[in-house]
């Protein structure tokens, strides 16, 4: 979950408070939807990015899911991976200095080496995702640069960094799936970031669970 402290009990209490105050779904329901292959929304704290991301576990990220993210999320479509898997793929960090405000750990962008055309279509991006998350994937299976943007989740998950990257990996693990996922920030029609009231409306409109 995104909302955390280093003490598990305090973290659970804070999450319960947010769920009660804002009508968010219990994290257990979000995990159940994730396991079933449904998309969901994760929001972070107002003191952090104050944004919501469309999320889906990697194995369920088909062309329809990618198209939904591109059409309705409008943000950057990213693939959250563990450090071990990015090393298996031989992916280098986009910039080792990483001076971004929230230390978002981008690697170089990627494309499936085989089976894609220009790489940007929903089907091509879904193929790239599935190629990259294959447990036997190697550097030879991936070309760079490309149209999917991998993110490296911190070891230790949301107990170490309260980011969407770590949250989707934690949820995938909790759902009994491989620890990866696809995320995309949600923007409004006017190009500004969707905040919690907007995200609640968005979730209701598209029948999605929303968690913290």
Regions found by a protein language model. Give the residues of each.
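Catalytic domains of riboflavin
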Residues: 15-211
